[in-house]
Regions:
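A nucleotide-sugar donor-handling region in carbohydrate enzymes
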Residues: 1-13, 42, 165-169, 173, ...
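Conserved catalytic-core segment of nucleotide-activated headgroup transferases in glycan assembly
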Residues: 1-76, 158
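Alpha-helical elements of Rossmann-like donor-binding domains used by nucleotide-donor carbohydrate transfer enzymes
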Residues: 16, 163-166, 200, 204
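A structural alpha-helix within SAM-dependent methyltransferase catalytic domains
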Residues: 18-22, 172, 202, 206
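Beta-sheet entry/capping signal
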Residues: 31-33, 96-98, 115-117
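Donor nucleotide-activated moiety binding/catalytic core segment of transferases
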Residues: 46-107, 111-112
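Catalytic binding pocket for nucleotide-activated donors in carbohydrate/polymer assembly enzymes
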Residues: 104-190
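C-terminal alpha-helical cap of glycosyltransferases
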Residues: 194-217
Length: 217
């Protein structure tokens, strides 16, 4: 599925977070670690490069804001290769709260039992560019994965800065809020949750090889 960074600017969500962590609005002293979408590192279309530049300006403006800068893999491979998965996973595991737009990363975050917020702060008119399709972030909440996330009450949805502040403070004060719902969400999304998929995959491949060897005899 196409990423929502293509549908609408993500900057309002990021700016709201940067302002909150740099003010006295949050229950705990906080810092913001920003992970941009791979499309943000494209120079065409210009909208992604322009939004990337605005985000890096936030990093310069606010002392407690940091942007993850992946190393390009070279050629057409772009950014965020397989070796980046450990970093992404650790961000979800060790963050106090993960904030994203509606995203399948909510499923991955729930695996780590980390509180999560879907931020849908819109820019009026979207991209406001001729012939560039825009879709309000608030309109994608009924898409399959996102609707299941909302129905499970596995996290909170923030449609404006005040809702974002309140949800952040709730989780910063008590990380166990919605823990039961997060677990139920994962049980509904993922068939087996014993962290042994690698072992089972290897056992299956080995069983296929053994059957093939028996047929060859």
């Amino acid at each position: 599925a196409i990423s929502f960074v293509h549908f609408a600017p993500n900057y309002p969500n990021i700016e709201a977070l940067a302002k909150l962590v740099s003010s006295d609005s949050l229950a705990e002293p906080s810092q913001l670690l920003i992970r941009l979408h791979p499309s943000h590192f494209q120079d065409k279309p210009k909208i992604f490069a322009e939004e990337r530049a605005r985000v890096f300006d936030l990093e310069k403006k606010y002392p407690h804001v940091h942007v993850v800068q992946p190393v390009a893999l070279g050629g057409s491979l772009g950014y965020y290769g397989g070796e980046d998965m450990d970093e992404k996973s650790s961000m979800m595991a060790y963050s106090d709260v993960v904030v994203t737009v509606y995203s399948t990363m909510l499923v991955e975050t729930a695996v780590h039992d980390t509180p999560m917020i879907a931020a849908t702060i819109d820019t009026p008119g979207g991209w406001n560019k001729p012939k560039k399709f825009s879709l309000s972030l608030k309109e994608i909440g009924d898409w399959p994965t996102h609707k299941r996330f909302r129905d499970a009450k596995a996290g909170r949805v923030a449609e404006n800065e005040n809702e974002l502040r309140d949800a952040l403070n709730m989780y910063l004060k008590d990380k166990t809020v919605d823990a039961k719902e997060r677990r139920k969400f994962i049980e509904n999304e993922i068939t087996v949750t014993d962290a042994s998929s690698g072992k089972r995959t290897a056992e299956y491949i080995l069983s296929v090889l053994k059957k093939a060897n028996r047929k060859d005899r």
